[in-house]
């Protein structure tokens, strides 16, 4: 059985001790990281969240304590009292901050014993993610995981600090809300008091933050828990955290400005990185045409170039058909990649097919010739113009796709990133932010045969496009903006509709009858009747931002207790079956 503290009080954290503490009597507490027995001396590295300190147990100092330490093993929890001593020069360990000192133990309490853990508690530990998630409390003892969660804490702390100083009020919104099935599936919570009725867990605080603006709070924020029952793609979680922000009496530039200043503050505070503001701005159209994506990674070039005008008269069927069907021909230049083998080029063609491309045309620019399956279909003039447009030099590889615009963009956008990774063109030390603005307000859903909101139904159209809402809905641009960091969207928002009539028109274009719109969003529509200010905001994916700031490979590494990709908690075994009694109370019958 473990000993009690018995009045012993910790004086220092393990990683905080240094030469300044030599001669002091200290009490440290933590876990045994490692143990080494050298006959008359036992060395223990004691670990807490601040780091490691070496403790020396010597027969000369205390025979009783020396005998007691013989039973101690890895991950035992100890309280140690002793004197801080400067190490001899030959024993200094430069790898750890406490490497110049050690503690000579005078008193030892074994607070808790440990079985041998299923994997070593160290960053080098080569263990499967499934085992790490099953024993998450052990995984979280590893220094890298503790650093990640402490960085995440510092991130939320810096966000709060900035927003508090800029007149924002933190307000919590409800977790049990009305289900409004638009977007992802809701998680439903049955009501025991009202049999047959259900609450939903919030996918975001969207409607409530708008109501807070109507209530006159002017500037709101919340570190909000959000839940979506969606089919999990790579690196999505059923529950996640948003930095949620809303402001009254603002236009797009006001929102972008305060967010740039917040991000600058956060990066300086957490990572000591100085960011230049304002960030770059790209319209949605420009981002698609230059980078093939609305989430462009600007740490490298390799921009898409439109070749359609050069090849308009081409006799090559692939080009002819693409242009005839309203598509385009575009290409990228991968500098210095002409040395790729035929096998590697064939793999690239297969890679391109994953994104709907029927094929991929490659050109190797060599000394005195251009090697490509397409050269025989091109005139010399066409070939020279392609080389000129793509700024080709000897040693370059040109990749060209001809298809519908969306296929061309998607394929070349992914190829651009793939080639940058293969040829190490990405400077991992850079943070490249960009605002993508002027998104289309609507998209057409072929399955449902109706228009759907690209962001959500409360996004305001640009003033100059309002008249197109019923006539040419797909031409309407939104007062919407996404913030992208190194090719990852970390946040997005919009100016909202604050006018009842415009909101009704929007619902109509989306195919909601007035009755249906009222049934889903009646309480918001009712609130609009009583004077709504112009308002807008943004929400950041906190997990994704923390992942980038810690250099982690997955958001699971910045969440204390994440679910797997199949939405399962391997540690607690959630979701699980519940008792018949619980189901009966809720008037629920399981029909599998």
UniProtKB/Swiss-Prot annotation:
It catalyses: tRNA(Asx) + L-aspartate + ATP = L-aspartyl-tRNA(Asx) + AMP + diphosphate. SUPFAM superfamilies: Class II aaRS and biotin synthetases, GAD domain-like, Nucleic acid-binding proteins. GO terms for biological process: aspartyl-tRNA aminoacylation. Belongs to the class-II aminoacyl-tRNA synthetase family. Type 1 subfamily. Gene3D superfamilies: Bira Bifunctional Protein, Domain 2 (3.30.930.10), GAD-like domain (3.30.1360.30), Nucleic acid-binding proteins (2.40.50.140). Pfam families: GAD (PF02938), tRNA-synt_2 (PF00152), tRNA_anti-codon (PF01336). GO terms for cellular component: cytoplasm. Its EC number is 6.1.1.23. Its main location: cytoplasm. It is found in: Cytoplasm. Keywords: Aminoacyl-tRNA synthetase, ATP-binding, Cytoplasm, Ligase, Nucleotide-binding, Protein biosynthesis. L-aspartate binds at residues 182, 228, 455, 496. This is Aspartate--tRNA(Asp/Asn) ligase. It is an enzyme of class 6 (ligase). Residues 206-209 are annotated as: Aspartate. GO terms for molecular function: aspartate-tRNA ligase activity; aspartate-tRNA(Asn) ligase activity; ATP binding; catalytic activity, acting on a protein; nucleic acid binding; transferase activity. Aspartyl-tRNA synthetase with relaxed tRNA specificity since it is able to aspartylate not only its cognate tRNA(Asp) but also tRNA(Asn). Reaction proceeds in two steps: L-aspartate is first activated by ATP to form Asp-AMP and then transferred to the acceptor end of tRNA(Asp/Asn). NCBIfam families: aspS_bact, PRK00476.1. Homodimer. ATP binds at residues 228-230, 237, 489, 541-544. It comes from the Bacteria.
